């Protein structure tokens, strides 16, 4: 009989194939778990509850980047009256020289506006402007005006700065070459009232007046009323050295161009500021179609397009007759010494109340 145990051989377990199978199964389970975790990040349900997969590369190809939604914003358009200076039909009062009396003058009537003279018709400055030139004259009340103005300008009433332009003897005499109006002999010109004037054709004159207007706007005035924007109209006018009129049809056209040029300089200096620009005209000039060849005024040719209003000193009984379709609805402002009840055009500047 053969030696050893019969019917048995050495035991080797289940063998290598079983171990390989288990390893593969374990790997598949791990991969499936990882795939499920990744898939969850790209799973979504629609409104009907159906499951969808959104693969990252497919999403980038199919869906363009959407800009963030802009919230609905209600745009409030500003009132044209506010942009133009808050009111159109003004009932204004011209305040006097003494700031201590201003509140009394304002409360004496139902005014929605007021005017303050910042540069008088003789050239005197009633406000201590930062703009300086040799020969300027500053009023003794200038500091009182500076102190009183902020309260008025911060109030609800419409504000007008009255600014005289070319009748300024002291500056004309001390700055004759750069600013003064000369006679034909080369000296300063004296008009019929023995007064001296600035020359509107000279750049320094334009710059000075434009700078004053800018300061008025920056103070907070709603409107700047220019007065004495004219050449002299009294005296020996043939003795004025107006400058060369070469290239112009006549002397009057040259003078009108200089006045219009000065107004343009002021207007351009005020660009970007919410302020109106207005002009005072004598009654005779306004009734003559806005033309004064001697003074260089041609209202509807170079001036009116730059103006918001025209102020005209006039008798109360003539007011309604002056109003036209072209100049009315607040564009024309009569300067009155009294306001009669019979006037239907309720727009005025009351002088010397």
Where are these regions (language model features)?
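Substrate-binding cleft of secreted/luminal carbohydrate-active enzymes
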Residues: 38-47, 299-353
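Catalytic domains of carbohydrate-active enzymes, especially glycoside hydrolases
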Residues: 99-125, 215-227, 302-311
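Active-site-adjacent "subsite" loops/lids of carbohydrate-active enzymes
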Residues: 83-94, 166-214
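N-terminal Lys/Arg-rich, disordered targeting/topogenic segments
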Residues: 1-18
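N-terminal, intrinsically disordered, polar/charged segments of Gram-positive cell-envelope systems
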Residues: 42-89
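Aromatic-lined carbohydrate-recognition surfaces of secreted/lumenal glycan-active proteins
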Residues: 94, 160-167, 225-228, 252-296, ...
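Glycine-rich, aromatic-flanked loop segments that form ligand/cofactor-binding clefts
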Residues: 113, 141-189
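Aromatic- and acidic-residue-enriched segments that line the glycan-binding/catalytic groove
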Residues: 128-136, 168-189, 232-246
């Amino acid at each position: 009989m053969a030696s050893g145990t019969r019917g048995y051989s050495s035991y080797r377990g289940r063998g290598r194939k079983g171990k390989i199978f288990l390893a593969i199964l374990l790997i598949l389970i791990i991969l499936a778990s990882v795939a499920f975790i990744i898939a969850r990040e790209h799973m979504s349900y629609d409104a009907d509850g159906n499951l969808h997969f959104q693969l990252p590369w497919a999403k980038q190809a199919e869906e363009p980047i959407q800009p963030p939604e802009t919230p609905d914003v209600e745009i409030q358009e500003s009132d044209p009256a506010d942009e133009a200076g808050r009111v159109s039909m003004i009932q204004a009062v011209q305040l006097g020289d003494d700031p201590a009396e201003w509140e009394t003058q304002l409360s004496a009537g139902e005014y929605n506006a007021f005017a303050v003279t910042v540069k008088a018709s003789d050239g005197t400055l009633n406000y201590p402007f930062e703009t300086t030139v040799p020969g300027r004259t500053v009023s003794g009340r200038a500091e009182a005006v500076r102190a009183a103005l902020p309260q008025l300008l911060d109030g609800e009433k419409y504000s007008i700065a009255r600014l005289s332009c070319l009748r300024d003897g002291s500056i004309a005499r001390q700055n004759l070459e750069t600013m003064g109006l000369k006679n034909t002999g080369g000296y300063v010109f004296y008009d019929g009232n023995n007064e001296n004037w600035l020359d509107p054709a000279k750049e320094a004159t334009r710059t000075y007046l434009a700078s004053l207007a800018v300061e008025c706007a920056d103070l907070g005035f709603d409107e700047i009323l220019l007065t004495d924007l004219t050449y002299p109209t009294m005296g020996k006018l043939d003795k004025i050295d107006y400058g060369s009129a070469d290239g112009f049809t006549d002397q009057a056209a040259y003078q009108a161009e200089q006045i219009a040029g000065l107004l343009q300089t002021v207007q351009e200096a005020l660009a970007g500021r919410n302020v109106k620009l207005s002009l005072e005209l004598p009654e005779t000039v306004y009734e003559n179609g806005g033309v004064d060849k001697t003074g260089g005024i041609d209202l509807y040719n170079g001036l009116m397009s730059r103006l918001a209003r025209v102020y005209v000193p006039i008798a109360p009984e003539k007011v309604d007759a002056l109003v036209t379709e072209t100049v009315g609805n607040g564009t024309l402002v009569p300067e009155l010494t009294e306001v009669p009840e019979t006037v239907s055009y309720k727009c005025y500047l009351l002088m010397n109340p």
